[in-house]
Amino acid sequence: TRMNTTFDYLFGKKIMKLDKVTASFKENKQVSSGLDFIKDDLYQSITNTSAFKRLDGITFLGAIGLTNKIGKKRDISRAEHSINVASLAYKISTARKYDEELTKHLCIAGLLHDIGHFPLSHSVEGYLSKKLNVDHHALGNLIIDGEFPQLNDLHKILKNKVNIPFIKSLLEKEVGKDLGGDIFSSQFNIDTIDGIYQSGLFIGY
C-alpha cells in the first residue's frame, strides 16, 4: 500500500543504512547548554519513542554531513537538532514568562518539528516528495496523528498529554505571536537559528 511504501522510505528500509551517525560520534553530542528542562518525564518519554529515536540516525546536513568534516565539529543528528530547537523554545518561553502549559506545548513543538524527515534530510527530500506526493511536514503530521503503527508510541503519549491540534498549528505556522507562534513562523525562527549555528560549526566558523 501507499502508506507501507511511505513508511519504508521514512523508516529507512530503502536508504536509512546510508545515513547513520556512528557510535563514536554519539559520544560527543553538540547540543545546547541549559537542557535541564529536557529531564522532565514528559520530554523524556517523547525522546524515548521509536518515532523520535529514528531521528538519531538521520544527519542534520544530509549527504554533506556524511563527508569528512571541514571545521572542528561533526554534523549532528536530526534528534540533536530537535533538542536544540526545543531548548531555544524553552529559553524564549522563560524570558517571555509564558505559563507552564504554553511553555510545554512550545517545547514539544520544537522536539517534533522535524519528526517527519526522510533519511539524508533535504538531500533526498525533493526526489522522495515527488515520488510519494508528500513532504516531511505532511509526514510529520501523519506520525503525530499515529498513522504509522510502527511509530504509534509517540501518538499514544501526545493524545493524553497535549493539545495535538495546537502543536500541529504551531508547526504549520498558524499561531500568532501572543501564543508564541512567532518563534516558529518568523523569518529568523528557532529552527533557522540552530541550523545556521550548526552549519557554521561544521564548516569551521
Feature roles, as predicted:
Residues 2-107, 116-205:
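Sequence-structural signature of the catalytic-core scaffold of metal-dependent phosphohydrolases
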